[in-house]
């Protein structure tokens, strides 16, 4: 279970993400240039804020209702304070995200018994796993204009979690040793 210490809470949490390729998936945001991912993130966060009642209450839906495309009449208990509000995330999220999540959840349910359940809430939105702005780097992992700068990990836009950030950081450290 999810807990800040003993991991013995009645609650559990996990993050399921979909890939968004800022160059291919966001043509509507092209006029923002390198900040298009940041603008898209702002729009997603605004959508969640509005759907939650313009407060810190998070919009949510039972997992089965999300996959089936129907509004949840009630939600499961949550450890998130200040709470959840039932919202049609299946139709609120851009189809780029919603359709990918729905098909992914359905596939998980086929492969892991008990995964596709009404006992789970889908809570929106966790709007990023890495930086919405990618700091450029060359084939040697160094910034193309600033010698000695090796953008890496989540902050540089090259990783989406602890393991991938560690792996990218290791690659950048090795590149720095060779390059410096």
Predicted regions and their residues:
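A conserved FAD-binding loop/helix module that cradles the flavin
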Residues: 153-179
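Short capping/connector residues at structural and topological boundaries
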Residues: 68-72, 127-130, 138-140, 163, ...
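An anion/pyrophosphate-binding glycine-rich loop and adjacent beta-alpha core
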Residues: 1-88
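A glycine-rich dinucleotide-binding beta-alpha-beta segment and adjacent secondary-structure elements
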Residues: 84-159
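Structural signal for hydrophobic packing residues in well-ordered secondary-structure cores
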Residues: 67, 71, 105-116, 173-180
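Glycine- and aromatic-enriched mobile tails/lids
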Residues: 5, 24-26, 76, 147-148, ...
């Amino acid at each position: 279970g999810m807990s800040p210490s003993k991991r013995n809470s009645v609650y559990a949490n996990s993050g399921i993400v979909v890939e968004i390729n800022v160059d291919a998936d966001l043509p509507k945001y092209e006029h923002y240039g390198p900040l298009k991912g940041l603008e898209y993130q702002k729009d997603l966060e605004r959508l969640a804020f509005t759907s939650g009642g313009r407060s810190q209450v998070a919009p949510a839906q039972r997992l089965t209702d999300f996959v089936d495309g129907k509004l949840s009449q009630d939600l499961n208990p949550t450890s998130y304070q200040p709470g959840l509000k039932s919202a049609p995330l299946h139709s609120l999220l851009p189809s780029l995200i919603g359709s990918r999540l729905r098909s992914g959840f359905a596939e998980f349910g086929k492969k892991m018994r008990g995964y596709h359940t009404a006992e789970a809430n889908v809570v929106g939105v966790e709007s990023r796993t890495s930086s919405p702005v990618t700091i450029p780097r060359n084939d040697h992992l160094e910034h193309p204009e600033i010698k000695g700068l090796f953008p890496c990990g989540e902050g540089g836009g090259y990783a989406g979690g602890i393991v991938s950030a560690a792996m990218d950081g290791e690659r950048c450290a090795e590149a720095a040793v060779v390059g410096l």
